[in-house]
Every structure is written in structure tokens, then in C-alpha cells.
């Protein structure tokens, strides 16, 4: 709103970017991020994306309820069970999307 310029490092601190990339490394860094997301809990990622889109038009109470329902659904998946067991065993979970 002020028209003040900021450099990339400050913009990253403000949360405008996930990461600053070194010159020439953007494609490699983007592929690594995509791989990391794809290896994660894809069902839960989909639920999160759905909630983000739906909650733009909700009040806070409805958004909190939607989040609670999404969590309850995600907690019924096999990926949740894998994540829980891996957490207890202090291991990294391997997600399968179910």
C-alpha cells in the first residue's frame, strides 16, 4: 500500500515466497519441491487445497468447522495411519495416497 520497494530476501521473510533460488537453479529447485509435494500425503494435500478454495467465502466459525471435518476425514486414511506409526517409531512415513 505504501509503494515501498523490497528486495527478495525481505519478501521471503514476509512470506511472499517459499524460497529464494540461486541464479540458474530455479528449474532444479522447482522440480525438487514438486517431488517433495508428490511424495507427501496426496489425499491430505488435496483436502487442504479444497479447504483453501472453499473457505475464502466462509466466516471464521464455518471455516473452523470445515477444517475439523477435513481433519476427521483425513484421519480415516491409511496414509494417516502410516504417518502416525512412523511418528511413534521416529521414522519418516512413506505415503501411498490412500
Regions found by a protein language model. Give the residues of each.
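Helix-loop "lid/cap" segments that line or gate small-molecule binding pockets
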Residues: 37, 51-55, 70-75
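Crotonase-fold acyl-CoA enzyme core
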Residues: 1-45, 77, 82, 89, ...
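Charge-dense, low-complexity intrinsically disordered segments
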Residues: 24, 58, 74
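Short beta-strand->loop
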Residues: 59-64
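Short C-terminal tail/terminal secondary-structure segment
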Residues: 56, 92-98
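Acidic-residue sensor for enzyme active/binding pockets
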Residues: 10-12, 67, 71
